[in-house]
Swiss-Prot record:
Its main location: membrane. Residues 114-115, 162-167, 216-247, 301-331, 392-407, 455-471 are extracellular. Residues 520-643 form the STAS domain. It is a multi-pass membrane protein. Residues 1-92, 137-140, 189-194, 269-279, 353-370, 429-433, 493-653 are cytoplasmic. GO terms for molecular function: secondary active sulfate transmembrane transporter activity; symporter activity. It is found in: Membrane. One of its GO terms (cellular component) is plasma membrane. GO terms for biological process: phosphate ion transport. Signal peptide: none annotated. PROSITE patterns: SLC26A, STAS. The chain crosses the membrane at residues 93-113, 116-136, 141-161, 168-188, 195-215, 248-268, 280-300, 332-352, 371-391, 408-428, 434-454, 472-492. This is Probable sulfate transporter 3.4.
Length: 653
């Protein structure tokens, strides 16, 4: 039937050879409404960059309401601030103080992981949370330094600049990297390009995070064993070589203290995981361990000097660091590269954590707003002696379990850090480095997700392979290259899906007009004279030749099967195009060429249910006209019914 007709035919049921007549209505396949090129471009841009239609809430509103909605959109704190009360404040104060007890020791620990002065970790737990509380859309995200971004920054910068021999330059590069991370993150949000981070697939992140966790854990052997001279490399082989080559530096006092507190921290973590109501045990244990270990070192300082400690930490607010940003020189490219990579990782972690807890409380986290909030807080942080920060899963989990209601919990946490910076810094003088190593170890062990990796193995072997590439790349090559390898494998997977799309043969489920894959439904049966194929992807220049060759191969194989079984001659190939969401000029040419080659073999090509834009392009390219009256149908059932009826009327077998 043509796309402009609509008629009813009588036909013999395709499921049997009886003469039973059934009435099947043959529907027309309509062209989409005509649109100008500008209308099409506008819709396409809207679908790509504005899938959430952010301007919808402003329609049919007064100017006053639009201004209010605009402020709420830019500053989410205005959305819930007017309804804030003492009951909410009580919950936020409790949760804020709880996460502060975790953020203070973690901030010091993660700064050392990034090869930065410990005080920078505390600075980074003060300014960024305040900015996020105003700009962020998550109620439960607890902001501060995180292990993965700290590790990546430390490993990338230390490859070119020594954090000990050239500490000032290293610090400048750290702040500059943070600035570029923020610029990159905010730009993604402003330009609504957040889909770019989707190239970091779940499998990639599982493998990368696990590999980074192993590297971080091995790096902590320096602190746990009391080693003074240690490699600056991050790969597993040089790290383990350094551990055993410096056995003479191992300190039994440090080892005993480290194992003791590590056991306590792991035990409290296990208790809180088994009984979430006891979350406060694992939340308070790092700070309690810092206090107890500091007292122990202070009391035994005159008897042993084997246990190293932090030493002097300056009191006071974050000093300005705008003058330390490094915008010219030999290391600028390194700062930009480090900023982009740490920016991607921290952004991915922050958004994932925010959405996780938002789903538990049934509210929405706006991805683009989060990108801008995280980006702006890192840009501001780089000017106030902070390094890359984002939402931490461990702190956010504690924040959620502690009953946080709004982002005010971040303000409370920052206030607690402020008090620490102003008055309590001398108390950390004797804090042993081994306790910082134990805290980091406890935090990163949970990043190795065995169950997620096993699920990848069960569900998708290629995803599991991607996960392994990321994991071993981080372990044996380097952290950034390991990530790059995993992203490359993910891109190859995408290319394979695009260039080698799936096609399947359909058959009829007896007693119905339903056609489904012969490979999935055993009861489905072939229709004599027809080869029914479904294409399950767009048809582009990258796969058009492959699809053409694959369909011709299907036809050859079907004809060979018919000859072997003395079956009914193959007359028609039906292509179900329901899943073909788009087609380009190469795809159109491939369809036209396929029709021509099939005609030479006395085979008819029929298209079924091409969707809007595909239908429009088929019409404009004259392919529908070339297919003729019986070359286009709405459903496979209608195509089989109409063609079978026509053959029967013409006396064809």
């Amino acid at each position: 039937m043509g796309h402009g007709t609509n008629r009813v035919e009588d036909m013999a049921s395709p499921n049997n050879g009886t003469a039973g007549e059934t009435v099947v209505e043959i529907h027309s396949v309509c062209l989409p409404p005509k649109k100008t090129a500008f209308q099409k471009l506008k819709k396409r841009v809207g679908d790509v960059f504005f899938p959430d239609d952010p301007l919808q809430r402003f329609r049919n509103q007064t100017w006053r309401n639009r201004v209010i909605l605009g402020l709420q959109s830019l500053f989410p704190i205005f959305t819930w601030g007017s309804q804030y009360d003492l009951k909410l404040l009580r919950s936020d104060v409790i949760s804020g103080l709880t996460i502060a007890s975790l953020a203070i020791p973690q901030g010091i620990s993660y700064a050392k992981l990034a090869n930065l002065p410990p005080i920078v970790g505390l600075y980074s737990s003060f300014v960024p949370p305040l900015i996020y509380a105003v700009l962020g859309s998550s109620r439960h995200l607890a902001v501060g330094p995180v292990s993965i971004a700290s590790l990546v920054m430390g490993s990338m910068l230390s490859e070119s600049v020594s954090p000990t021999q050239d500490s000032i330059l290293y610090l400048k590069l750290a702040f500059t990297s943070t600035f570029f991370a923020g610029v990159f993150q905010a730009s993604l949000g402003l330009l609504r390009l957040g889909f770019m981070i989707d190239f970091l697939s779940k499998a990639t992140l599982i493998g990368f995070t696990a590999g980074a966790a192993v590297i971080v854990s091995l790096q902590q052997l320096k602190g746990l064993l009391g080693i003074v001279h240690f490699t600056g490399k991050m790969q597993i082989v040089p790290v383990m070589s350094s551990v055993f080559n410096h056995r003479s530096e191992w300190s039994w006092e440090t080892i005993v203290m480290g194992i003791g507190f590590l056991s306590i921290l792991l035990t409290t973590r296990h208790i809180s995981m088994r009984k979430p109501k006891l979350f406060w045990i694992s939340a308070a244990s790092p700070l309690a361990s810092v206090i107890i270990s500091t007292l122990l070192v202070y009391l035994i300082r005159s008897k042993t000097h084997a246990i190293s400690f932090i030493g002097h930490l300056p009191k006071g607010l974050n000093p300005p660091s705008l003058n330390m940003l490094y915008f010219s020189g030999a290391h600028l490219a390194l700062a930009i590269k480090t900023g982009i990579i740490t920016g991607i990782l921290s952004l991915t972690e922050g958004i994932a954590v925010g959405r996780t807890f938002a789903s538990l409380k049934n509210y929405q986290v706006n991805g683009n707003k989060e990108m801008m909030a995280i980006g702006f807080m890192n840009m501001a942080g780089s000017c106030t002696s902070c390094y890359v920060t984002t939402g931490s899963f461990s702190r956010s989990a504690v924040n959620y379990n502690a009953g946080a209601k709004t982002a005010v919990s971040n303000i409370v946490m920052a206030s607690a850090v402020l008090v620490t910076l102003l008055f309590l810094m001398p108390l950390f003088y004797y804090t042993p480095n081994v306790i910082l190593a134990a805290i980091i170890l406890t935090a990163v062990i949970g990043l190795i997700d065995y169950q997620a990796a096993y699920k990848l193995w069960k569900v998708d072997k290629f995803d599991f392979f991607t996960c392994l590439c990321s994991f071993f790349g981080v372990l044996f090559v380097s952290v950034p290259l390991g990530l790059a390898i995993a992203v490359a494998v993910s891109v190859i997977k995408i290319l394979l899906h695009v260039t080698r799309p799936n096609t399947s043969e359909f058959g009829n489920i007896p007693g119905t007009q339903i056609y489904q894959s012969l490979g999935r439904y055993r009861e489905a049966s072939r229709i004599p004279g027809f080869l029914i194929l479904a294409i399950e992807s767009p048809i582009y220049f990258a796969n058009s030749t492959y699809l053409q060759d694959r369909i011709l191969r299907w036809a050859r194989e079907e004809e060979n099967r018919i000859k072997e079984n003395n079956g009914t001659t193959l007359k028609c190939i039906i292509l179900d195009m329901t899943a073909v969401s788009a087609i380009d000029t190469s795809g159109l040419e491939a369809v036209f060429e396929l029709r021509r080659r099939l005609e030479k073999q006395s085979l008819q090509l029929v298209l079924v249910n091409p969707v809007g834009t595909v239908m429009e392009k088929l019409h404009k390219s004259k392919i529908i006209e070339a297919l003729g009256l019986s070359g286009l149908y709405l459903t496979v059932g209608e195509a089989v019914a109409d063609l079978s009826s026509t053959w029967k009327a013409n006396g064809q077998p």
